[in-house]
């Protein structure tokens, strides 16, 4: 799939289906890294999100250009949701929908100022949705803190068909820890703290930031506070001194 450039290429599911069915006697672990949503936000039907009717998040400056781009962003999320539906339908067709743990997550916040490339909540607090028929309660929400490093240990524990909650003995010590007890409803908590790091390289000049959160409060430390934060994808220029993202100039000019 290539949705980062325009013109785009349609996504295909043949490889996914082939991987799921390559050996019915063996379980599988499949990671599908969807490109969407990603700038330039050209997938989906943006007409379904008229700029004047959009409700912007409070951290985004309300300008006409921001509304237009945010509508395209929402359209691409809708397109991605359709992709997820097709993948789940493919899993259903293999006959393994009921015995497969499905995890859906996101890489980081959206590519708007103050989101992606920051350690703020809008940059690092992402979705995590789980589905596992007969094991994960549908519709249940939890405030348990987890990090990406916890996913692998969780999958390893879930693959233990005899005792899923048993901490598997690995030849190496993973950086994370299994949150399977949370998924199975055995615990409402996992971590006391989650951590974040951003150095701004190669996205711009060095501007290292470290963060820690207990789920309610977030502490950030700028290691070079006297430096200027410049993120080239938002504030940088491309050929003929054109801004990479035009909405940034409207923030400076109109707010």
What are these language model-derived features?
Residues 21, 92, 184-190:
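Basic phosphate/pyrophosphate-binding loop/patch that engages nucleotide-derived ligands
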Residues 1-7, 17-173, 198, 211, ...:
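Active-site-proximal cap/lid insertion segments
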Residues 202:
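Active-site loop/lid in soluble adenylation, ligation, and acyl-transfer enzymes
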Residues 192, 216-217:
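Short, surface-exposed beta-edge/turn micro-motifs
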Residues 205-206:
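Extended ligand-binding clefts on enzyme/binding-domain cores
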Residues 169-185:
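Extended, compositionally biased low-complexity polar/Lys-Gly-rich tracts
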Residues 176-181, 190-198:
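Polar, glycine-rich mid-to-C-terminal structural blocks
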